[in-house]
């Protein structure tokens, strides 16, 4: 029999790094085509005008312009990009 207690080990002491999700460009901010506006899991926010939806549900700008968050209907939000108005 061992006269010293064996080395213990921890089993549940692991964690994964955060995924850096969320809004990257806020309402009223200027974006260039290709800029990521939101990284999300699922379509918490739906794509509106002049934005694309990536296969991981990332919303990105298709044109240069200003970001605008809008209400699509009672349960849904959408984000759009509107071009700069030339006066």
From Swiss-Prot:
GO biological process, alphabetically ordered: translation
Region described as Disordered: spans on this chain: 1-21
InterPro entries per the UniProt record, alphabetical: Ribosomal_bL27, Ribosomal_bL27_CS
Keywords: Ribonucleoprotein, Ribosomal protein
A GO molecular-function descriptor: structural constituent of ribosome
A GO cellular component annotation in the UniProt record: cytosolic large ribosomal subunit
Source taxon at top rank: Bacteria
Entries under NCBIfam families matching the protein: L27 (TIGR00062)
Family: Belongs to the bacterial ribosomal protein bL27 family.
UniProt protein name: Large ribosomal subunit protein bL27
Organism: Nautilia profundicola (strain ATCC BAA-1463 / DSM 18972 / AmH)
């Amino acid at each position: 029999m061992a006269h010293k207690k064996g080395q213990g080990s921890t089993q549940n002491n692991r964690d994964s790094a955060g995924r850096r999700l969320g809004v990257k460009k806020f309402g009223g901010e200027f974006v260039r085509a290709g800029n990521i506006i939101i990284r999300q899991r699922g379509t918490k926010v739906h794509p509106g005008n002049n934005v694309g939806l990536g296969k991981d549900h990332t919303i990105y700008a298709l044109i240069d312009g200003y970001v605008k968050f809008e209400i699509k209907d009672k349960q849904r939000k959408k984000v759009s990009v509107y071009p700069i108005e030339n006066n």
